[in-house]
Structures are given as C-alpha cells and as structure tokens.
C-alpha cells in the first residue's frame, strides 16, 4: 500500500517562478520530504488512536521515497494476530474488539467458539537463543484460535487486518489525515520558497 502526494503550487507560482531552476528543485524536494515525515507521524498517530492494537509499529512499517515532484509513503506488513488487539476471556465466550469506537464481539462461527491458548506444536523447541527464550526451550505461540470443525485437531489462529490496510483506510486513517497533509505541503512549500528568497536578497 502506498500513497502519493503531489504539489499544487498555484498559490505560490508568482514567487516560485522568480527562483532559479536549481532553487525550485531544492525547495520542492525539501517541502516534500518534510511533509512526508509529518504525514508518517500523523498517519501513525491516527491509526493508534483508531485501533486497539498495541505496539503495532505503524510508523516503522512506513518507508518514504521522494523526488522533486512527488513523495511516496509505502507501508508493508502481514495481517496482525487478533490477540494483539483488545481481547476478553471473561465468561464462556472469547470476545475481541478491533476498533476503539467499537465493542467487544463474541468469536463464534458455526457454533464453534474461539479460545486463547498456546497453539505451538508441543514438541517444538527453539533452535537458538532469542529474547523469548534459550535454545532448546519450548516454543510458546499464544493466539486467539478456533477449530476448523468439530474435531479436536485442525486449529487456525485468528487474524485482523494488516498494518498497510489499517493505515490506508479512507474512512478511518488516511482519509482523515489527507486534508492535513495537503495543507502541510502548501505551508512547507511556502516556507522553503521564503527561505530561498531571503538567501537571494
């Protein structure tokens, strides 16, 4: 998922044309870089304020590339485990809430209830030391899971959306922040043009 933000220089064209070509390019590139970094922070904050997931690494998942004409923010990431969102095991049904403005919803499909447990193979051990344990220690993979049928085996972990999908949401994240990004770009462009003009005085 990536978003491209272009430049509307109509409001600064008169002054912009008075700059030399090299200074025009520098001002545009500087404005785009600054705006892209501001956008990455705003997108991350908006996503964190929208979803119940903890430590999703929204900001780290976004990479910026910019030229003198446009900036691109790319987000990468796999679907997140549902256990990383708000989950309640109270009562006889596991419930989960993905949106902060949402509510806890029971996880039941075809009368089969989800559960929270270690779903790693009981014989699986770590091959080398890691922050989660020493080599040879048993692997634990805690997840919200659900059986695929009535039989005991055939278990699948439950996932929510990926980081790029959440960040790119027109309704909840990108669509909310986009007007601010456009305004920031115009403000930043004016600022760098003013700086260039001051150097030429």
Kindly give the residue locations of the regions a language model identified:
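Short, Lys/Arg-rich flexible segments
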Residues: 3-201
């Amino acid at each position: 998922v990536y978003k491209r933000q272009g430049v509307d220089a109509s409001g600064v064209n008169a002054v912009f044309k008075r700059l030399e070509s090299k200074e025009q390019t520098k001002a545009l590139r500087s404005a785009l870089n600054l705006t892209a970094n501001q956008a990455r922070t705003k997108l991350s904050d908006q996503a964190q304020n929208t979803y119940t997931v903890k430590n999703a690494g929204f900001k780290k998942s976004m990479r910026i590339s910019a030229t003198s004409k446009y900036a691109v923010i790319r987000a990468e990431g796999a679907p997140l485990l549902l256990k990383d969102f708000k989950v309640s095991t109270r009562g006889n049904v596991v419930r989960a809430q993905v949106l902060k403005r949402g509510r806890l919803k029971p996880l039941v499909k075809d009368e089969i209830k989800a559960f929270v447990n270690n779903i790693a193979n009981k014989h699986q051990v770590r091959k080398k030391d890691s922050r989660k344990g020493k080599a040879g220690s048993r692997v634990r993979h805690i997840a919200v899971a659900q059986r695929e049928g009535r039989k005991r085996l055939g278990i699948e972990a439950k996932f929510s959306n990926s980081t790029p999908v959440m960040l790119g949401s027109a309704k909840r994240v990108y669509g909310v922040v986009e007007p601010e990004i456009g305004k920031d770009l115009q403000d930043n462009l004016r600022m760098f043009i003013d700086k260039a003009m001051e150097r030429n005085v």
